[in-house]
Amino acid sequence: MLYRLARTGFFQLDAEKAHDLAIQNFKRFTGTPIDLLYRQQLPNRPVECMGLTFKNPVGLAAGLDKNGECIDAFGAMGFGFVEVGTVTPRPQAGNDKPRLFRLVEAEGIINRMGFNNLGVDNLIENVKKSNYDGILGINIGKNKDTPIEKGAEDYLICMEKVYQYAGYIAVNISSPNTPGLRSLQYGEALDDLLSELKTKQSELEEKHGKYVPLALKIAPDLSDDEISQICESLIKNKIDGVIATNTTLDRSIVEGMKHCDEAGGLSGRPVQSRSTEVVRKLHEELGDALPIIGVGGVDSYVAAKEKMMAGAKLVQVYSGFIYKGPGLVGDIVKNL
């Protein structure tokens, strides 16, 4: 009820202004009596995945807390894990505004943010200040002005800097809002990137005395053959997990709706079915070789269960959280 009232107010604002205001309020009120409005104690539903123990299988997807400013707030809401970022080596402003749009009737969101963030060093300082005791994922990407043929360098820079602070590292090569980025999902480009990341992982494991898993985040807009090739590369390079999926460029489900023609990636309920199909295809190809984190339209216990029945070990929420609020986390966890 409280969230529905708050949402009514927030939805009167421009989508990005509402997002920024929410982040500011979470920063301001976490640790004060006001955070009782969203703090919740949930039953433990531990899941072993990528060599880590997650308190429960429901995580926050990357993109909501790009700079790691509200880790403790999201921890208080009962998430089993929190993924921050996407973060790049250098700060960047992202794409021109407006760049975030609600498709309310479809419970979807279109964004063309463009990896706006304050840079990896800023994120690390925020992580250091956090008291969160759950699994923290850090999602890394490349700067827009880094040539795609040198993209691996950006991932390696970020990986080296975040390694000791991350529970796992998510490698984002699937955002549609950085020109050329999705080309890294294919063929030799993917093999070369994963090989370099795996080599760096071994070096950093020796340096820091701990193993931090790597998970690759992929797009929903892939053919079965492309998914098969990605799976081959994941297994060949001994990557620890795969996150499926990012946002879609497909607009067929939202055709005719307000904002449907805005450029960018579509998330939320409209991508639910396709992302679940990608999870299912990945599971057919991978079996138990590496775990899948399912994301895309997880806006209810039923949607979460569908992802898990398709083969996901964990799930993440973002757009569903915007539309349903923190209660969504509890609804999923309590019903599993």
UniProtKB/Swiss-Prot annotation:
Binding-site list for substrate: 66, 111-115, 172, 177, 246-247
Localization recorded for this chain is:
Cell membrane
Pathway involvement of the protein, from the record = Pyrimidine metabolism; UMP biosynthesis via de novo pathway; orotate from (S)-dihydroorotate (quinone route): step 1/1
State the superkingdom: Bacteria
Kindly state which reaction or reactions the protein catalyses: (S)-dihydroorotate + a quinone = orotate + a quinol
Q: Which GO terms describe its molecular function?
A: dihydroorotate dehydrogenase (quinone) activity
> Which cofactor is recorded for it?
FMN
Signal peptide position in this chain?
none
An example Pfam family from this entry, by short name, is DHO_dh
**Residues involved in FMN binding:** 62-66, 86, 139, 172, 217, 245, 268, 297, 318-319
Q: Name one GO biological process term.
A: 'de novo' UMP biosynthetic process
Q: Where does the record place the catalytic residues?
A: 175 (nucleophile)
Self-association state and partner proteins as the record states:
Monomer.
Q: What does this protein do?
A: Catalyzes the conversion of dihydroorotate to orotate with quinone as electron acceptor.
**This protein's name:** Dihydroorotate dehydrogenase (quinone)
Species of origin reads Vibrio atlanticus (strain LGP32) (Vibrio splendidus (strain Mel32))
